[in-house]
Amino acid sequence: YGFWSPWGTAALPVVNVPGGAITLTAEGGIEAALSWTPGSFDYYLVYRNGVAIAKVTEPSHTDAASIGGVRYQVRGCYDNSDNYSLSEAVEITVGTDNVRLYDMERGEWLHFLYDSSAHRSTGLSLSQDIQYVQLSGHTYPVAERSEFKSRALRIACVCADDAERQSLRALLGHLTCCKTPEGNMIIGYPASITENSDDFFSTYSFTIEQIDRKEEINIDS
């Protein structure tokens, strides 16, 4: 037999002693260019919309994988202490006037202004997996909606010289970020590229499908 005391309560104070102030500056455009005042910190955590996306040691970071209105913050941290400093949040808009492709493995932007037609056409496909089951006692099928979705961009562009052709062909099988003027962004792999050439230029078409990509980093690693 044993006797148990009532549950007790204890206050566990958590005290943060911040270091120097961090002043964050962010510039929008095709990508987000971040810079901040350096301090005596060992490393910095970069947050986009509340999610830690990068751990860096230099007082700057470029985020190519964002679109639209974005909110950034930077946290200065120490290796041997849990103390930190947090910058004020900065909001910017990231976008593009033309279809832009970013080779995330080579760190290179590709800029294609032209299409084979007078007006560029870019196709966006969205789908949600819905299964229909015919059950006894129901006149119409019952819909079962799963969590699976797909999102893909169909891109067509023109290359007028060999350097552009080689850059585009090099995207095959590379993790690629595609942004459009309509505010769409897809990150995935071009699995196939179709090329048609004449005496003047080469026309390329391909599809990039959104992959399940975890951006949040492990801040303890």
What does each model-identified segment do?
Residues G2-S40, D79-R106:
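Pro/Thr/Ser/Gly-rich low-complexity, intrinsically disordered linker/stalk tracts
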Residues Y43-V46:
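Short beta-strand elements bearing conserved aromatic residues within extracellular beta-rich modules
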Residues V51-E58:
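Short beta-strand segments within Ig-like beta-sandwich modules, predominantly Fibronectin type-III
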Residues V90-S221:
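Extracellular/virion structural assembly segments
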Residues W36-P38, A65, C159:
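Non-cytosolic beta-sheet module surface loops
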Residues Y1-F3, D63-N83:
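Beta-strand-rich modules
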Residues S60-S66, A156-C157:
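Exposed aromatic-hydrophobic patches
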